[in-house]
């Protein structure tokens, strides 16, 4: 019930603000915090695009995140994550779910905090 109330408030606030701006709604949090699930619900409610950064990376590379880490290493993954995230954040009026560790990246953090509406889920 609490989640429903919070989602309703997010949607009412966001609909008014996001449709008049170039901002995105960005969901942040550690792995398993609900970024993708809640982001998907919010995007459907607002009838705007949903971008899941981890899914975008998997499509781009053709491997799961786990396989990318195993085969290419974390450094490679973080480089792809940065490029994919910053490119996605250039779009406007979308709901974006970041990867669990993406917000530790200075460029991503600065872009999100300076130019978008963000929600930390825990």
Identify the residue ranges that each predicted region occupies.
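ATP-dependent small-molecule kinase phosphotransfer cores
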Residues: 49, 53-113
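Conserved phosphate-donor/acceptor-positioning beta-strand/loop module used by diverse small-molecule
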Residues: 112-122
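Walker A/P-loop
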Residues: 36
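Hydrophobic anchor at the beta1->P-loop junction of P-loop NTPases
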Residues: 27
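P-loop (Walker A) phosphate-binding loop of NTP-binding proteins
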Residues: 30
